[in-house]
Design a protein with these regions (language model features):
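C-terminal scaffold of the Radical SAM
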Residues: 101, 124-129, 139-171
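Active-site neighborhood of divalent metal-dependent phosphoester/pyrophosphate hydrolases
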Residues: 8-10
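Conserved small/polar residues in nucleotide/adenosyl-binding loops
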Residues: 179-182
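Aromatic-lined carbohydrate-recognition surfaces of secreted/lumenal glycan-active proteins
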Residues: 174
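Radical SAM/AdoMet-radical enzyme domain recognition
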Residues: 2-4, 13-133
Length: 182
């Protein structure tokens, strides 16, 4: 069994996130927890430490990165969060938390997937997994479909190179493609 905690942004509830984790741990002790977060709040070392103090035996924080270039990540996100996200990753690693990276692939980012993979290898060797995610066409992505959508077939060369680069170096890359009925 697994419980996914997402949002919005789950860390916006502050310390109540730890109350929730501890409650799940008490009531469903064998249940894995997956938290999808932008990672920014974990740039606060104290907050990252509080997560570690929950001592949940099967918890993973999944954090999306949109580029290996700060300006590009910030443009896509719409806020200057790159360096705080990176610091959050380092703080979580400092406290030995299991981390997954989510790399959302779209028209504006696919060309740099091999360089992005190299960046991940050199800067985040501690992550448990790297998931290359096909873009979901919801929310702002749906509104900007023409600027963002690219068929996975059209980026398979770059994706293959990125995945093999990470796998050959002992990391755990995954590919997530979404089924569409169209």
């Amino acid at each position: 069994q697994e419980i996914g905690i997402t949002g919005g942004e789950p860390t916006l509830i502050g310390d109540n996130l730890f109350t929730l984790i501890n409650h799940i741990k008490k009531v469903l002790p064998q249940t894995a927890i997956s938290i999808l977060s932008n990672g920014v709040k974990f740039a606060d070392k104290e907050y990252a430490m509080k997560l570690a103090k929950c001592r949940h035996q099967d918890l993973q924080i999944d954090i999306p990165l949109f580029s290996d270039i700060a300006e590009e990540h910030n443009r896509i996100v719409g806020a200057k969060t790159f360096y705080k996200t990176v610091q959050g990753l380092y703080n979580l690693a400092l406290f030995r938390q299991r981390i997954g990276l989510r790399i959302v692939v779209h028209k504006q980012t696919y060309k740099r997937l091999p360089q992005f993979a190299d960046f991940i290898y050199h800067n985040f060797p501690f992550v448990a997994q790297i998931a290359f995610m096909q873009m979901e066409t919801t929310g702002l992505a749906k509104e900007n479909f023409d600027e963002l959508w690219i068929d996975p077939y059209d980026y398979n060369r770059e994706l293959r190179e990125a995945v093999l680069l990470l796998a050959d170096r002992g990391m755990k890359p995954y590919i997530c493609l979404l089924y569409t009925s169209d």
